């Protein structure tokens, strides 16, 4: 895949976990975290030396999720991780979303139990 360079990449990206097209939240806390590149590296991937930090879900990300959520739901993508550069989606992680533990580190709520509850609910009602 080739894409134009997005200047926001130098400040890192935000991973947001979605379930059934909506941000996974527990007690109002979003399952999300920031990935920050190290040094002169623009990629924020942890394997490239990036670090994590608490994320803020702003209106731009909320609007993007509202637009893409119904498409994910329609296509049967129940649990995904969306990576954002600013308010632009730069990657959809559909097969291995990852990040529940990192989100817990900053929000200190049990996203795993809620995710499992929603997965069981999904598979027992369909």
Feature annotation, model-predicted:
Residues 1-61:
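Phosphate-binding site of ATP-dependent enzymes
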Residues 55-126:
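ATP-dependent carboxylate activation and anion-phosphoryl transfer catalytic cores
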């Amino acid at each position: 895949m080739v894409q134009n360079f997005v200047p926001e990449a130098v400040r890192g990206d935000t991973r947001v976990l979605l379930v059934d097209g909506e941000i996974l939240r527990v007690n109002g806390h979003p399952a999300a975290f920031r990935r920050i590149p190290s040094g002169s590296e623009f990629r924020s991937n942890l394997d490239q030396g990036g670090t994590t930090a608490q994320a803020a879900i702003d209106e731009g990300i909320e609007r993007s999720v509202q637009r893409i959520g119904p498409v994910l739901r329609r296509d049967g993508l129940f649990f995904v991780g969306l990576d954002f550069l600013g308010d632009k989606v730069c990657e959809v992680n559909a097969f291995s979303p990852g990040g529940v533990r990192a989100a817990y580190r900053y929000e200190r709520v049990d996203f795993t139990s809620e995710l499992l509850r929603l997965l069981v609910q999904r598979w027992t009602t369909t």
